[in-house]
Amino acid sequence: MSTRKAVIGYYFIPTNQINNYTETDTSVVPFPVSNITPAKAKQLTHINFSFLDINSNLECAWDPATNDAKARDVVNRLTALKAHNPSLRIMFSIGGWYYSNDLGVSHANYVNAVKTPAARTKFAQSCVRIMKDYGFDGVDIDWEYPQAAEVDGFIAALQEIRTLLNQQTIADGRQALPYQLTIAGAGGAFFLSRYYSKLAQIVAPLDYINLMTYDLAGPWEKITNHQAALFGDAAGPTFYNALREANLGWSWEELTRAFPSPFSLTVDAAVQQHLMMEGVPSAKIVMGVPFYGRAFKGVSGGNGGQYSSHSTPGEDPYPNADYWLVGCDECVRDKDPRIASYRQLEQMLQGNYGYQRLWNDKTKTPYLYHAQNGLFVTYDDAESFKYKAKYIKQQQLGGVMFWHLGQDNRNGDLLAALDRYFNAADYDDSQLDMGTGLRYTGVGPGNLPIMTAPAYVPGTTYAQGALVSYQGYVWQTKWGYITSAPGSDSAWLKVGRLA
């Protein structure tokens, strides 16, 4: 795996835009491939073309309404960017919320595609066939999200795709730039709990797991919050830790130590919840960041609209025709005032619309507040990315993923900022203060502290609180008069690991 941090950008283009593709009319295609300049191509390691789907034959497929010649033209334009960056990978992404969520239009196909060995083989082969036919460099699966009953089949499907990709890499002589396999992973504990007990098995065949560490707040919640807070704010909301119910088979002491509850729903929490599981290498974890904001109406002004009740509809799609986000032209076009691209937010802030840009130094995120109209917008910008980039480096993560390329401003300032923070020789963040925001404090098998202790001696009777080293870990007795071996019963708690 490359030592360069991954910078993975989704390129989202719906079927109607593919079929009418043009690079000269932004009213038809708001973000054509030509907007990805050579400079931007050099700043990226991956572009994830989105989305393909799984059809009723349980094969990876384009939307049946897609004009194939037009689709090939768009993909060819993307792959041509590799002339400016030979190490750039153009992946294709299967799924997305619309297709794959529990109520998604194709959800049953995702379930059935991993249900039996025959179905998995058919699906895996179709993924590689699409990859080869259209000239992609790998497969990204964005199933949001497998239920517990589907996880074993999902793992088996990933393993089968991995095997085929490895074989294809050798067959095509691509050992210098192998075909890759990635997935989009849950950024919140509720969805993560579906597959958390088998997280290491899911990650094993992957090159990266791209955490969707955004949409952590939205109109479905009763109060406003930051959608991608790096750290927690004691003034903000907390949530029940659903990972306590992830069928891990741990003792109550282990569960409460690993999964404090309630807790702040943050980027840091999601990352640490992955790192605490054994078999999940930090270099495979990719932090997701949003290139868009989430807006709320009907907020109060005591705290700049933060942590306020609101009157924002939570239905999907947006049920009304009241486009209340002042200055948001995209909202009228897309018929939804609750989402605005960074490009649009920048224009709203620069215009004379009454917005204030404010900063929360606990969460390390900006937000917009419109006092007169009672509006609150949570988003990220180049300043918040400084802290997230430093965190990625501190935690030795694989890199960053963002949704999506078309939401940056025309100059690509957000992408350029990420590239600078990771790669610029003259950029130094050693003095950047990460602040005092609330950190996730859970401790599990993968992030136990390094400790030392006397070796366990069989036949010894140990008092309550005694520490011993055994089979690479440090163990502590929960009560006294213990004669059993560490890990053989509930009398011992694993508290550390040996160097």
UniProtKB/Swiss-Prot annotation:
Alphabetical UniProt keywords: Carbohydrate metabolism, Chitin degradation, Glycosidase, Hydrolase, Polysaccharide degradation, Signal
Entry annotated with the keyword Hydrolase: yes
Biological process annotations from GO: chitin catabolic process; polysaccharide catabolic process
Domain spans labelled GH18: 42-425
Name assigned to this protein: Chitinase B
InterPro entries reported for this sequence: CBM5/12 (IPR003610), CBM_sf_5/12 (IPR036573), Chitinase_II/V-like_cat (IPR011583), Chitinase_insertion_sf (IPR029070), Glyco_hydro18_cat (IPR001223), Glyco_hydro_18_chit_AS (IPR001579), Glycoside_hydrolase_SF (IPR017853), Glycosyl_Hydrlase_18 (IPR050314)
Annotated residues for binding of chitin: D68, A69, G95, G96, W97, Y98, Y145, M212, T213, Y214, D215, W403
Coiled-coil features, chain-numbered ranges: none
Top EC class of this enzyme: hydrolase
Organism: Serratia marcescens
Chemical reaction(s) catalysed: Random endo-hydrolysis of N-acetyl-beta-D-glucosaminide (1->4)-beta-linkages in chitin and chitodextrins
The UniProt record lists the keyword Signal: yes
Record-linked Pfam families: Glyco_hydro_18
EC number: 3.2.1.14
Single GO term (MF): endochitinase activity
Gene Ontology CC entries for this record: extracellular region
